[in-house]
Amino acid sequence: TSRGLGDVYKRQETKAIRTVKDNLKEIAAGEKDACEKLMYALILSGLAMQMTGNSRPASGAEHHMVHLWDMEVVNGHLDALHGEKVSAATMLVLLEYKKLADAIRRGACRVHAFTDGDRELLQKTFGRKGILGALEKENTPELLDDVSTETLSGALPEILKIIDLLPAVTDMQEMMSIVGCVSRVRDIGLPGEVIEESLRLAPYTRRRLSLLRLRKMLTY
């Protein structure tokens, strides 16, 4: 089945990512064998998307944030390349997820029912651009309406386990530095003031139940 094949590609993609991680310096130096390993990982990523029928194997909350920036509702025009924006967004999302993990670990994360607390901000940003109607259509019905506080509370330990699988922030920064990736929003021309709005608004750009969207039911 497509799902079974998707699981196979997921395992292969994970292995390929580890290989890329182990060859960062060689990739940065442009060594042929290392670059081939990088391309192989990228191809597997594409195949994983094809097998699962969506872009989730290679596109998560960090891409939703980039879509937000491309809409220019919280920022002006950015000259940065798509990959540079994804790189900066990846660090923002990783920082937030690690912050959440720390709160869960300390028992300081509280789950509450979803409330539409972003209405004013949505009107100020997407409404000003004249695209709020399209955004509301994209997000109707609201995915969080089907998430119970009991279910989410029970899932927190598993969420913590998954976040702990992600690289530490310092490790990710080091890896990005090795290959010359940007890791700060200011590197792509964004002021730090847009970070919180980006975290709040990014989930609305795609109708996906991401952890960044679930964050709207969490206080930590």
Task: Map each language-model feature to its residues.
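Short, charge-rich amphipathic segments
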Residues: 3, 17-32, 130-138, 157, ...
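Generic alpha-helical structural element
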Residues: 27, 34, 54, 58, ...
